[in-house]
Amino acid sequence: MTQGPIQVNSEIGRLKTVLLKRPGKELENLVPDHLSGLLFDDIPYLKVAQEEHDKFAQTLRDEGVEVVYLEKLAAEAIADKDVREQFIDDILAESQKTVLGHEAEIKTFFAKLSDQELIDKIMAGVRKEEIELKTTHLVEYMDDRYPFYLDPMPNLYFTRDPQASVGRGMTINRMYWRARRRESLFMTYILKYHPRFKDADVPVWLDRNSPFNIEGGDELILSKEALAIGISERTSAQAIERLARNIFKDESTTFKKVIAIEIPNSRTFMHLDTVFTMIDYDKFTVHSAIFKEENNMNLFTIEYDEAKDDIKITHSNKLRETLADVLGVEKIEFIPTGNGDVIDGAREQWNDGSNTLCIRPGVVVTYDRNYVSNQLLRDKGIKVLEITGSELVRGRGGPRCMSQPLFREDI
């Protein structure tokens, strides 16, 4: 089989190509009255957030990683006039709650923009003051204090969640919160129309029209034979089972097991990758709370049963033993955020201390502010590449959240 543009069969194989989104004007459209609806706790300073993100990207390039940007790929994907018009229609259709019947005026506004300007504007959001309206309808006389016709998408720099590379294919995800649901439309168009992907026959294991929610922060590729997926507030058990069935029936895949891991429904445990991330063949960074719960967690191993031509599901509550078994190692080492200290651990977990990006076995990218965790990693033989994230972290995501691997070398 010809090598395609997507290949991710582990969390730790040498990273060759990664998808990022540089923070843009969408962060400047965050206002205190509407923070919670857009899933933010604070407002990052855009200039500094961009500087921090640029240094993150350069750190990856310095390690030989090709960095591609969501906003650039999306603009290139809509170069065809008909595709561009369909993309605009789709965006407006998914923004009906705020568009308020002004599709024609918004389309006139968009017509003046280049492809890149259009993508940037849709991501940033369209303020009402940007659109000229004639007051011919009653709704236009109403004093609607909501400031946007198209909401900004400030979470887009967390490219991990709207899509996920799984083997040689992707999941294009139905996001849990309405504020993020439009985000996966960009990758839908990129796979379908971008020259790099459109003729590559990239399998889509789940698409965004699925009735069940799933987010990439809950999807971990343990090995070429096993996935771990969090059952969380944002990822449903139904989505995990459907994904497993779709993967198992594809003869080109090597995946044989999907480990569904139930995690608490809370912002602290937003996704599985805020609980633990894999950083070496037998090592994981973990939320220190795992040590209290690791033998009481609900784990469900989904496998294909050839005799029954159906899936079978087995239950366990031993996290460490289950991981060791599927990874084929003698034992698993958990490295706790903040060394498990009640103060340091809580502080560094809040600042995404366990959300590390592995760029090859034993080499990770972390926020420099999590100095207790970083020193512990070094003591365990891990090479730590630190980046500054004082503004980036305000979105409550770390280096893994901010990156979507498109290609890793197999291990």
UniProtKB/Swiss-Prot annotation:
Catalytic activity as recorded in UniProt:
L-arginine + H2O = L-citrulline + NH4(+)
Which cysteine pairs are joined by S-S bonds? none
The enzyme's E.C. designation? 3.5.3.6
A single GO molecular-function term is: arginine deiminase activity
Cell location:
Cytoplasm
Which top EC class is named for this enzyme in its record? hydrolase
What keyword terms does UniProt attach to this protein? Arginine metabolism, Cytoplasm, Hydrolase
Catalytic positions are C401 (amidino-cysteine intermediate)
Keyword Hydrolase recorded: yes
Q: InterPro entries attached here?
A: Arg_deiminase
Which HAMAP family did the record assign? Arg_deiminase
What is stated as this protein's family in its record? Belongs to the arginine deiminase family.
Q: What is this protein called?
A: Arginine deiminase
Source organism per UniProt: Staphylococcus haemolyticus (strain JCSC1435)
Gene assigned in the entry = arcA
